C-alpha cells in the first residue's frame, strides 16, 4: 500500500489535486497539522472534485502523532535536498507499506527530520535554475514511479466514461 504524507500543507488546491491522485491510485493520504486551510475550503473541494469521499484521508495532530500511529521503516522523503532520484530506489524490494513524505509548499519537511533520514531522501532531477516543482505534481510523479516499478497493481488503464474501444468508434 502506498501512503502519501503531506507535512503541514499550506495550499488547498495542491491538497485537492493530491486527493485526486490518491483516490485514483488507491493510495492513503495523511495530512499532518497544522494545515494552511480548512478541509471544507472551496479550493480544496474544486481541485479534489468529488474524489474526497472515496479517498482514505487521515489527519494527524503533528509529526510525532503520525509516526506513533504509522511506525514504519519505509519512509521516503521528497525534498530539494535529496541526493537521489526516485528511480534510484528499488521499490519492488520494499516489504510492507511505502510512505512517501512531501513537505509544505513554503519550507518543505522539517530539516531536523531530514537530517536523520538522508539515505531515503529523494529529489526530482531538473535544470539547475529551477528551485522546485509544484507539490501536487511532485506527489503524482513519485506515486506513479512507485506504481510503475510495482507494475500498477490493482489499477486499470481502461477509459471509464466512454469505454475501452471508444477510439475504434470514430469514423475517418
Segments from the language model and where they lie:
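Post-transcriptional modification and biogenesis factors for structured RNAs
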Residues: 1-172
Amino acid at each position: 500500500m502506498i501512503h502519501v504524507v503531506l507535512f503541514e500543507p499550506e495550499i488547498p488546491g495542491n491538497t485537492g489535486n493530491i486527493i485526486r491522485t490518491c483516490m485514483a491510485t488507491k493510495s492513503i493520504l495523511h495530512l499532518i497539522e497544522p494545515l494552511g486551510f480548512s478541509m471544507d475550503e472551496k479550493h480544496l473541494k474544486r481541485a479534489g472534485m468529488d474524489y474526497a469521499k472515496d479517498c482514505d484521508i487521515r489527519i494527524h495532530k503533528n509529526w510525532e502523532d503520525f509516526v506513533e500511529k504509522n511506525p514504519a521503516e519505509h519512509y521516503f522523503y521528497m525534498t530539494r535536498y535529496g541526493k537521489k532520484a526516485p528511480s534510484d530506489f528499488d521499490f519492488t524490494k520494499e516489504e510492507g507499506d511505502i510512505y512517501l513524505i512531501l513537505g509544505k509548499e513554503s519550507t518543505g519537511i522539517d530539516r531536523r527530520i531530514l537530517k536523520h533520514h538522508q539515505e531515503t531522501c529523494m529529489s526530482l532531477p531538473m535544470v539547475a535554475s529551477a528551485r522546485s516543482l509544484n507539490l501536487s505534481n511532485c506527489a503524482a510523479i513519485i506515486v506513479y514511479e512507485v506504481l510503475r516499478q510495482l507494475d500498477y497493481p490493482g489499477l486499470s488503464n481502461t477509459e471509464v466514461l466512454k469505454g475501452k474501444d471508444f477510439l475504434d468508434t470514430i469514423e475517418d
